[in-house]
Amino acid sequence: MIVIEKVDKTPVVKRLVEIVERKGQGHPDYIADGISEWVSRYLSRYYLEHFGIILHHNVDKTLVVGGQAAPRFGGGEVLQPIYILVSGRATYEVRTKDGVIKVPLGTLVMQAARDWIKQHFRFLDPDTHVVIDYKIGQGSADLVGIYDLGVKSVPLANDTSVGVGYAPLTPLEQLVYKTERLLNSRDFKAKYPEVGEDVKVMGVRVGKEVKLTVAAAMISKLVKDKSHYLSVKEDVKKAVEDLASKVAPEYNIEVVVNAADKPEHGIFYLTVTGTSAEHGDDGMTGRGNRANGLITPMRSMSLEAAAGKNPVSHVGKIYNVVAQRIADKVYNQVKDIIEVYVEIVSQIGKPINEPKILNVEIIKSGELTGEVRNEVEAIAREEIEKITQITDYILRGEVSLY
């Protein structure tokens, strides 16, 4: 059932207060999300390559337990490694007409986790700074039976869940997202290699006044002394201020970098590896960014952890992606839309292209005419009809999940 309604509420951009957060690439929660998702992708590709279908799995319960480190200007060492536990459930043996085939679960999990760390960090060594472990409930599958049921049919929802999307992003939401992406960009790291990957951004707006708090871990061995640290910190601040002047010129923006620093007491945000996980900061899948890459308490949000869930039938993942696609298309293609929210609810056991309800909330100028309703409904139906394509987008890394 598709419901389209005009709602009478103040758009976020016009509210007095707005709060937006993003946990960046090296944050412990982001690490958990990233590893969960890569394990799912490695499993999915293995299943596809060897059995022609993606078999059941959900690995959306990764835990990152902080280690201990002793950073110092010009050096430092990791004293106790970060402990990463990947948990969930996956198919580990498959019965075929030729016999039982075992899936190398452990090898795939370890390889996925190591590869993710290597690709997203420059100074975190997955072999010496991290202990990777896994506790995955093991299931089996009857491939002959699966084919008899028809693997090409529309998957059935394996949960009763909700996915949420909205559009457009406010200037503050864009600024928070782009700030983290800037500081973790290849160009910025080439210019300022001292800046680590653990970047967290919190934006608070009251009227036209914005305070942007940026926590950026610094790489201790690349920072020779206090003055060097403060110089890089000032360069980070200026870079963010320059970005802010382009993304949100209508606001008065104050940028604060590493607010917990107390130089007079020798307290600086230094890390050996580039992540706060090296010294007691823990993380877990689903505790960080929502599927659009932001934490937005002023918006409707799903609390589902999209990362690590199977990309075929788990609506906690798929519906968040589809809801965002519908919201973006409605905002971009339908005239006079100010804001749009989309909520999609599944019913366990039903085909994923038959949601229990697909609700579209519209804030717009003027009336919600029959023509507008038809346009919105056509967009929603098209995306739901194409829902099985989402799996490929996810496996190719073409959609935001965290």
Swiss-Prot record:
Is Cell membrane included in the keywords of this UniProt record?
no
Biological process annotations from GO: one-carbon metabolic process; S-adenosylmethionine biosynthetic process
Q: In which pathway does it act?
A: Amino-acid biosynthesis; S-adenosyl-L-methionine biosynthesis; S-adenosyl-L-methionine from L-methionine: step 1/1
Q: What is its EC number?
A: 2.5.1.6
The record lists ATP as bound by G137, Q138, G139, S140, A141, D142
Q: What class of enzyme is it?
A: transferase
Superkingdom of origin: Archaea
What Pfam families does UniProt report for this protein, alphabetically? Answer: AdoMet_Synthase
What the entry lists under PANTHER family is as follows: S-ADENOSYLMETHIONINE SYNTHASE (PTHR36697:SF1)
Described purpose of this protein according to its UniProt entry? Catalyzes the formation of S-adenosylmethionine from methionine and ATP.
What is the protein's given name?
A: S-adenosylmethionine synthase
Species annotation: Pyrobaculum islandicum (strain DSM 4184 / JCM 9189 / GEO3)
Species lineage, top-down?
Archaea, Thermoproteota, Thermoprotei, Thermoproteales, Thermoproteaceae
What is this protein's gene name?
mat
